[in-house]
């Protein structure tokens, strides 16, 4: 008798955030339930969904938004929800760890078990995205998590612009890549629109590694008061799911709330990945230059 292929249905959520934690967590739960109704097994919520994207401004008071990982109320609530519905939920949050702070995601398995933590590795610093003020560079390294439905890799927002991160997770056996995100307009340049670039970069990761990829981004205009006036970002959504050759399988627009779903045959994709040869023909002995900042070759 032929073995059944492993089918997994993934989902990306997209919604506008208020600056009220309870409202945002309730919205996330409502959309998780909607995704479950559509058959989703692994459901991605956007980055730092508990409130506004506070990193627009450097304000000491915003450190009060951070909470310790263990016993975090939103993680506990999502554990209960995951167990009730039998779904996997990566949960993004602002983590306080003694005197360190991280942009983190906890991976909740379908029985409510917390599988562990990933801390954002690449921390941006620019107008409107002043994350270095709040977050230490992550110390977990890129990881994969064996969930009930698939082995997954999860990284966060700015990580998605680095092909090394996607490849590191794929090399560890990630069968699907997930990127919770908060990205939109550039306060210093009204003419800069990165949405298409943003999507294409990750479609490239999917195609280069022959794995599906899920990206969840917020929508809506958020205004943060600063000492120099207001900072404003309009988040452009554009959440999407890409297939293992980089093709767009499901995509949202820039204004509407969305629940995107797509199903993948993991065994079929595994065969394609092995047959394509990109892992067979790798030359790690020639890649040492990737371990340098200036491109110098350390091999004499």
Curated annotation (Swiss-Prot):
Gene Ontology biological-process entries: putrescine biosynthetic process from arginine
Residues covered by the CN hydrolase domain: 8-266
GO molecular function: N-carbamoylputrescine amidase activity
Statement: the UniProt record of this protein carries the keyword Membrane: no
Disulphide bridges: none
PROSITE patterns in the cross-refs: CN_HYDROLASE
Pathway(s) where this gene product acts: Amine and polyamine biosynthesis; putrescine biosynthesis via agmatine pathway; putrescine from N-carbamoylputrescine (amidase route): step 1/1
Active site as annotated: 47, 120, 157
Record-given protein name: N-carbamoylputrescine amidase
Native species: Solanum tuberosum (Potato)
């Amino acid at each position: 008798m032929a073995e059944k292929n492993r089918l997994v249905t993934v989902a990306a959520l997209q919604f506008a955030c208020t600056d009220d934690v309870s409202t945002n967590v309730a919205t996330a739960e409502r959309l998780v339930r909607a995704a479950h109704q559509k058959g989703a097994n692994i459901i991605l919520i956007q980055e730092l969904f508990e409130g506004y994207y506070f990193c627009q401004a450097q304000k000491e008071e915003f450190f009060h938004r951070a909470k310790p990982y263990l016993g975090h109320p939103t993680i506990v609530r999502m554990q209960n929800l995951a167990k009730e519905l039998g779904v996997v939920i990566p949960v993004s949050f602002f983590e306080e760890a003694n005197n360190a702070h991280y942009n983190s995601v906890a991976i909740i398995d379908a029985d409510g078990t917390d599988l562990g933590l990933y801390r954002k590795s690449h921390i941006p610093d620019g107008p409107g995205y002043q994350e270095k003020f709040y977050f230490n560079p992550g110390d977990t390294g890129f990881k994969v998590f064996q969930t009930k439905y698939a082995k997954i890799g999860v990284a966060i927002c700015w990580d998605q612009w680095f092909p090394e991160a996607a490849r590191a997770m794929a090399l560890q056996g990630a069968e699907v890549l997930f990127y919770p995100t908060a990205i939109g307009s550039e306060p210093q340049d009204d003419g800069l629109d990165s949405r298409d670039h943003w999507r294409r970069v990750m479609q490239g990761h999917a195609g280069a590694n022959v794995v599906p990829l899920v990206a969840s981004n917020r929508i809506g205009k958020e205004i943060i008061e600063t000492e120099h006036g207001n900072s404003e970002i309009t988040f452009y959504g554009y959440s999407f799911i890409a297939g293992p050759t980089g093709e767009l399988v499901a995509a949202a627009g820039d204004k509407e709330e969305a629940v995107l779903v797509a199903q993948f045959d993991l065994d079929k994709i595994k065969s394609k990945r092995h047959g394509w040869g990109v892992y067979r023909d790798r030359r790690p002995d020639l890649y040492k230059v990737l371990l340098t900042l200036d491109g110098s070759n350390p091999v004499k």
